[in-house]
Curated annotation (Swiss-Prot):
Cofactor binding note from Swiss-Prot or TrEMBL: Binds 1 FMN per monomer.
SUPFAM superfamilies (UniProt xref): Flavoproteins (SSF52218)
Catalysed transformations (reactions): a quinone + NADH + H(+) = a quinol + NAD(+); a quinone + NADPH + H(+) = a quinol + NADP(+)
Residues that, per the record, bind FMN: 10-15, 78-80, 113-119, 134
Cofactor: FMN
Protein name (Swiss-Prot/TrEMBL): NAD(P)H dehydrogenase (quinone) 1
Organism: Rhizobium meliloti (strain 1021) (Ensifer meliloti)
Binding-site positions, NAD(+): 12
Gene3D superfamilies: 3.40.50.360
Domain Flavodoxin-like: 4-190
Pfam family for this entry, one: FMN_red
Disulfide pattern: none
Length: 199
């Protein structure tokens, strides 16, 4: 049984929702799954004034525990075409793991969100891939076997690089049924590959 970590940062709850869908998919494929978040860097008064969702029950991860999993699925919103600094800050503390090769051969994957259709979803995930490769991870995306990313009948996130959701400029749009389905598919896909590699 593969051990999968869904590691995320979510300011307004969209990525939190996607993270739980990813975890659901991984569990459906037989994985043991932990959902954890990275620490918030924004001062609490600023976060409250900005209406951040601060009541997220997922525990905060430690850098060292990343080595305990067979797969890590990273999730964070897009900030100006790149990953939110909270997740980047956490990842940038993994030098000790890198030096010891602790993540070599583990599966890595990512999902994201943006305010608009062309708000940097692909560039955000692509920006995380070099980090995974420097760690020697096996990168897995969201293949076109997931047919939900085909077609143009509705506004939706998602690409071969990973699942994503579009939040709207005011954050009022929640992940759609097809976006959540994509997240579940990606979680299951990662879990199956991780299980094969762990054998």
């Amino acid at each position: 049984m593969a051990r999968v970590l869904v590691l995320y940062y979510s300011a307004y709850g969209h990525i939190e929702t996607m993270a739980h869908a990813v975890a659901e998919g991984a569990r459906s494929a037989g994985a043991e799954v932990a959902v954890k978040r990275v620490p918030e860097l924004v001062p609490e008064d600023v976060a409250k004034a900005s209406h951040f969702k601060l009541d997220q029950p997922a525990p905060v991860a430690t850098v060292e525990e990343l080595a305990d999993y067979d797969a890590i699925i990273f999730g964070a919103g897009t900030r100006y075409g790149t990953v939110a600094s909270q997740l980047r800050n956490f990842i940038d503390q993994t030098g000790g793991l890198w030096a010891k090769g602790k993540l070599v051969g583990k599966v890595g994957s990512a999902f994201t969100s943006s305010a608009t259709q062309h708000g940097g979803q692909e560039s955000t995930i692509l920006g995380l891939i070099p980090t995974m490769m420097h760690h020697g991870m096996v990168v897995v995306g969201l293949p076109y076997a997931f047919q939900g990313q085909m077609g143009v009948e509705e506004v939706k996130g998602g690409s071969p690089y990973g699942a994503s959701t579009i939040t709207g400029g005011d954050g009022s749009r929640q992940p759609s049924a097809v976006e959540l389905e994509a997240a579940r598919f990606q979680g299951a896909h990662v879990a199956r590959i991780a299980a094969k590699l762990a054998d």
